[in-house]
């Protein structure tokens, strides 16, 4: 028999009660986290979003009706409890619970709902498959660790709004149904019923609208906004994700960076109680690539890349010598204490290198007694070995590993190996927050597949001022274009990009030239971006901004392995929602109304 809630009102959340409440009569609502019968006395751990408290139904003290109902309670039954807060008997305290020194002596118990057999226990550290957790997400979220993550996410929202509103930003919404302007990832398309054959697109970002808001005189805009990208998914990707997006007029890079650092500092202080040191570190894109093998460097550990190209060009080891003669480079990493690696471990490391594009991996062990062990050491003079050891800071007990290839492949492979080694050797400290701004990015890069230059960030990023006057030259010579640097900046935290932005192009004339540089014709530019180009003609102020990946920030703040763990209802890596079975087929009459025919290749049916 299910009881009615009626006029029963909660006084406290379970986790809010303390010893100061001893003697108080309280009313609580929640779920039965666990039920135990000890010699006829029934103990129920009652749970809500704030925590757990023990309630006691003693047949010698509680009303008979309450006791009879308590005997029927099972895990995850929904309960209303009225009783008095009392101190737990000495020796029965539970130090694992914040409420572990008190309990509720029950005077009234209502069973508001029952619960079917659970697919997994409602507790932290479960081993249930992720797809099962997502199918029963309403149960998964009840688990304390999931609840805490969503509460923290809410607190990040609140802190963001407090900080930005306090610094003169206006929260302005931009459209969810907009024009398809595919640059990079695919758009999610929405058919327009009233304009058959035409489609809206869900926005990949509010980029163009926030620039137009600057033209509109808003001056400082922000939004916590959903964005959509139809791309292949990884652990840090979702088809729909949330950005903290802002834009400012009459600013340069320093202004945007100052606001960004202030916001992150405020969020960490308000939500985690952590005082971050400002300003954050900075390094150029080139420095990041050449020291760490990536434009998202993790500064929590060393393992820096060292360049031995000047030595390699003169050695007898053919792989090194030939690579340098062909314009390549030779770089390495000193794995401190790595001489203890077995040959199998080194072979495994070589296979890791090959996964990321290396043809092989050379290595030299410096044994504890100073002797060298390596199949390549015979090709080096003693002077060359000593010089390599000096550059690599090699000492007894170290393992030196080398990659010889093109500039791009060498850095990419060593960047991945650096991360792999840090994880293998447990070099990554916990509870350390290493922020770094990466600046001075190339404006463009060459895309082999498309056979044209593409924007490294997006086509609305301004070149450095010294490069603007050379745009005509760059349009004629891609080598000149590849030397251009942009006014872009990315913020990296512990090896993860958490935000990126730039100073934008605010001149329609320069914007058209950048489109031309990227191989976008006047007709294509007008078709895709005509509304922006037109707006830039009407007194657009200099402006810039940034977008933070909110999901990624919350994942890092909570120590989550995937952003799926900090999103209430995420998609799987295949873009499926197991809870609702979306995406799904729709009815034929819905398609007819839209004027759409679906052609599904046979192999996908």
From Swiss-Prot:
This is Aspartate--tRNA(Asp/Asn) ligase. Aspartyl-tRNA synthetase with relaxed tRNA specificity since it is able to aspartylate not only its cognate tRNA(Asp) but also tRNA(Asn). Reaction proceeds in two steps: L-aspartate is first activated by ATP to form Asp-AMP and then transferred to the acceptor end of tRNA(Asp/Asn). It is an enzyme of class 6 (ligase). Its EC number is 6.1.1.23. NCBIfam families: aspS_bact, PRK00476.1. PROSITE patterns: AA_TRNA_LIGASE_II. Pfam families: GAD (PF02938), tRNA-synt_2 (PF00152), tRNA_anti-codon (PF01336). InterPro entries: Aa-tRNA-synt_II, aa-tRNA-synth_II, aa-tRNA-synth_II/BPL/LPL, Asp-tRNA-ligase_1, Asp-tRNA-ligase_1_N, Asp/Asn-tRNA-synth_IIb, AspRS_core, GAD-like_sf. Residues 207-210 are annotated as: Aspartate.
């Amino acid at each position: 028999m299910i009881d009615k809630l009626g006029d029963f009102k909660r006084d406290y959340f379970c986790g809010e009660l303390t010893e100061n409440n001893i003697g108080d009569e309280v009313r609580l609502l929640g779920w039965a986290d666990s039920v135990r019968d000890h010699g006829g006395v029934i103990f129920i751990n009652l749970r809500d979003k704030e925590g757990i408290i023990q309630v006691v139904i003693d047949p010698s003290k509680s009303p008979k009706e309450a006791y009879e109902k308590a005997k029927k309670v099972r895990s995850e039954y929904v309960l209303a409890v009225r009783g008095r807060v009392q101190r737990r008997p000495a020796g029965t305290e539970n130090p694992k619970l914040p409420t572990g020194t008190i309990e509720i002596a029950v005077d009234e118990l209502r069973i508001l709902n029952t619960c079917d057999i659970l697919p997994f226990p409602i507790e932290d550290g479960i081993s249930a498959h992720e797809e099962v957790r997502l199918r029963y997400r309403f149960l998964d979220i009840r688990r304390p660790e999931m609840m805490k993550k969503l509460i923290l996410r809410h607190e990040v929202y609140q802190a963001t709004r407090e900080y930005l509103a306090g610094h003169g930003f206006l929260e302005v919404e931009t459209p969810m149904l907009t024009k398809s302007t595919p640059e990079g990832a695919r758009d999610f398309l929405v058919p327009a019923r009233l304009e058959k054959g035409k489609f809206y697109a869900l926005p990949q970002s509010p980029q163009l609208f926030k620039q137009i808001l600057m033209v509109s005189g808003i001056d400082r805009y922000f939004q916590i906004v959903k964005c959509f990208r139809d791309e292949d998914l990884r652990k840090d990707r979702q088809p729909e994700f949330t950005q903290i997006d802002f834009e400012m007029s009459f600013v340069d890079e320093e202004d945007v960076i100052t606001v960004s650092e202030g916001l992150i500092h405020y969020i960490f202080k308000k939500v985690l109680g952590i005082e971050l040191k400002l300003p954050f570190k900075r390094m150029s894109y080139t420095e990041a690539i050449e020291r760490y093998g990536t434009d998202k460097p993790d500064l929590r550990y060393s393992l820096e890349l060292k360049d031995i190209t000047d030595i390699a060009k003169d050695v007898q080891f053919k792989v090194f010598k030939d690579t340098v003669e062909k314009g390549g480079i030779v770089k390495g990493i000193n794995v401190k204490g790595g001489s203890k690696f077995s040959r199998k471990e080194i072979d495994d490391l070589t296979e890791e290198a090959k996964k990321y594009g290396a043809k092989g991996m050379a290595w030299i062990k410096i044994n504890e007694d100073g002797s060298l062990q390596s199949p390549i050491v015979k090709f080096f003079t003693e002077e060359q070995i000593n010089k390599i050891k000096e550059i690599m800071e090699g000492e007894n007990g170290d393992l030196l590993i080398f990659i010889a290839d093109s500039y791009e492949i060498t850095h990419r492979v060593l960047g991945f190996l650096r991360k792999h080694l840090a994880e293998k050797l447990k070099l990554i400290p916990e509870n350390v927050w290493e922020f770094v701004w990466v600046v001075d990015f190339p404006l463009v890069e060459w895309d082999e597949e498309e056979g044209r230059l593409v924007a490294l960030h997006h086509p609305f990023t301004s070149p450095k001022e010294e490069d603007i006057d050379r745009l005509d030259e760059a349009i004629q010579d891609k080598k000149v274009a590849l030397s251009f640097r942009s006014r872009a900046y990315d913020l990296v935290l512990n090896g993860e990009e958490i935000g990126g932005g730039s100073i934008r192009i605010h001149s329609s004339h320069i914007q058209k030239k950048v489109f031309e540089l990227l191989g976008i014709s006047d007709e294509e530019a007008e078709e895709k971006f005509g509304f922006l180009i037109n707006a830039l003609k009407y007194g657009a102020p200099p402006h810039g901004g940034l977008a933070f990946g909110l999901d990624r920030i919350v994942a890092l703040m909570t120590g989550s392995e995937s952003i799926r763990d900090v999103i209430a209802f995420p998609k799987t890596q295949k873009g499926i929602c197991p809870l609702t079975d979306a995406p799904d087929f729709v009815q034929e009459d819905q398609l007819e109304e839209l004027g759409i025919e679906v052609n599904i290749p046979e192999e996908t049916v």
